[in-house]
Amino acid sequence: MKGLFVTIEGPEGSGKTTLIKSLLPYFEQKAQKVMATREPGGIAISEDIRTILHKQEYTMMEARTEALLYAAARRQHLVEKVMPALNEDYLVLCDRFIDSSLAYQGYARGLGMDKIFEINRFATEDCMPSLTIYLDIEPEVGLARIEKDAGREVNRLDMEDISFHKRVREGYLQVVERFSDRIVLVNADQPMEKLIEEVVQIIEDKLL
């Protein structure tokens, strides 16, 4: 693996997608081979799994089913899109990766971070990011952003009660502590221009 694998993590409404859309042209202008993608999704099979995971009417989905679907989508996305790009020396910017599963299914769903980590180690063959940016934000602020975003489709996870979203953030903070060697926490409750500037500086200082 020759390229650089950067993942952007955070609770709902933290600004991950908007951030990546801004990072992509910045690094392209620097003559960097760069690719943006997302989880679950990024390729046809994983996008189909994403549709299942996000369907509002699938409220009966059991936690283990959810965890395994995310891991399956991750595996296919990794081997079909991410690894080939890394082998061609790309900077890959990915909206979510393993840490999402640890926070959402491992902690918030109560399945256990160690169990979810082992499932995903198998799915990814121990492929881990070069760097992870965690966008930290209070759940109330993130969910309020979602409500104001008319262009964003509300998914099944958005519909969870506030206690779930608080557990997600708690889970993320534990993940940040556990993997402090590769995860940098950034305050997402700031103007997007400042957030972009801060994240660009982190990526350039640590990787480029």
UniProtKB/Swiss-Prot annotation:
Its EC number is 2.7.4.9. It comes from the Bacteria. The keyword Nucleotide-binding applies. Keywords: ATP-binding, Kinase, Nucleotide biosynthesis, Nucleotide-binding, Transferase. One of its GO terms (biological process) is dUDP biosynthetic process. One of its GO terms (molecular function) is ATP binding. Phosphorylation of dTMP to form dTDP in both de novo and salvage pathways of dTTP synthesis. This is Thymidylate kinase. It comes from Bacillus cereus (strain ATCC 14579 / DSM 31 / CCUG 7414 / JCM 2152 / NBRC 15305 / NCIMB 9373 / NCTC 2599 / NRRL B-3711). The gene is tmk.
